[in-house]
Amino acid sequence: MQVQLSESKNPLAYLLLIAPFFLWGTAMVAMKGIIPHTTPLFMAGVRLIPAGVLILMVAGFMGKPVPKSWLAWLWIIIFALVDGTLFQGFLAEGLVRTNAGLGSVMIDSQPLAVALLSFWLFQEHIGLWGWLGLGFGIIGISLIGLPQEWIFNLFDSGITIYTDNWQQLFNNGEWLMLLAALSMAVGTVMIRFVCQYADPVMATGWHMIIGGLPLWGISSVLESQQW
């Protein structure tokens, strides 16, 4: 059943439009609260695999076709590693090193990367106001994520970057959140190629399962006391 939200006057339709943003924000808070009781990579796998199984069950009930060609599975595997393993791995590790609110803001840099990738790959234009918004967004994300010393030095005496600054940048949670956002952006663009060979619902379910398995594998080697 197709719902025309733009033509509906039902208040529930507008709630459905903002629901993903609300659920996304609460997910960050929930993950931050769970991390002290488990390990980040194990938790990331738990986020993916059960949800993937549920999606496959729904897809089977809906009669969605199972991917059959090797190209379909190749794209699903690549999609899984980028949008599943890398995204959820960076996200979980980043939340260990930053708070949920700041982490959510850093993840919101993902639309900026999607716009740039779409312009490069598909020649999709967002117009003058879109690029202006992207510029303000990049400035805001930079002010949030870059070390304060870099920003102060830029206004005082130009950019002077030391080794300690690089170590601080690569070790803090904000940088990991940016890597998570970039992984999610690449995955968002990749779904267009995935859908050429596989049903999007089936591909989503399988990519969550396949993407979660490496997280559990890495967790079993590098982490302890997951339970």
Where are these regions (language model features)?
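Membrane-embedded alpha-helical segments of multi-pass transporters/permeases
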Residues: 52, 56-60, 119-120, 142-145, ...
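Residue-level signature of transmembrane alpha-helical cores of multipass secondary-active transporters
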Residues: 16-17, 21, 76-80, 92, ...
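Membrane-helix interface segments
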Residues: 9-11, 65-74, 125-131, 199-200
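Glycine-/small-residue-enriched transmembrane alpha-helix faces in small-molecule transporters
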Residues: 1-45, 152-196, 214-217, 221
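Specific alpha-helical transmembrane segments that line the substrate/conduction pathway
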Residues: 42-53, 82, 91-130, 134, ...
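Juxtamembrane C-cap of transmembrane helices in multi-pass membrane transport proteins
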Residues: 26-38, 50, 88-98, 106, ...
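Hydrophobic transmembrane alpha-helices of multi-pass small-molecule transport proteins
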Residues: 55, 77, 117, 126-162, ...
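Specific transmembrane alpha-helical segments of multi-pass solute transporters/efflux pumps
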Residues: 23, 27-28, 56-107, 115, ...
